[in-house]
Amino acid sequence: IDPMNILGIIMPEKESDPESELLGEEIAKQLEIQTQKIDITSILESFGVYEKKEKIVKEKFPDFDKNCKYRVAIPSKFSSSIGIPFLEILDDKGKTQKFKISTTEFLELTAASSIKHRVRMTMLYYYAEKNNFCVVGTTNKTEFLQGYFVKYGDGGTDIEPLTKLYKSQIYQIGKFLKIPQKIMKKNASPDVWSFKTSDEEFFYSVP
């Protein structure tokens, strides 16, 4: 495919990892792919995404402010702990604290976070239709088999070329394409929490 027929949409927001934006721009430049950056913070604010999540966070940690970061995680893989999700907060002094959350709180936190995926999908389709392009997904075989994608979010695509490939095979392709090591070694993440979270910390672990 001619790089001129590919458009990469970079969608930062106030809780996303700035490194993701930089790496996205770097790989697009290497592959000679044109990009467009749209900050979706104001859109998410209009849905009350941050307000909904921070309400629960502040109930657990009243001192929470803009200098703190937070995420929902599960016990480390293959530990003896029951896999019950918890809220983890990184305060402005670099100290982490964990808090129990109810099923209702967990569902509300993840539901609000899923809005981020769906806003991203909406923006992708706007630019796809505007340019007569199709939306390409990045779900791999492990994610597809486990259902690790958001319905009408990152699962809302026209084609999914990677669902026949395990992540190990995708790394082989990345090596063949000479993708920078800092991208290859970066933990896969949904990038919906202000406190960095990998797929394994948030959703699943496999041997």
Spans of model-derived segments:
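Mid-to-C-terminal catalytic subdomains of enzymes
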Residues: G137-P207
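ATP-dependent adenylation/nucleotidyltransferase module used to activate substrates
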Residues: I1-T139
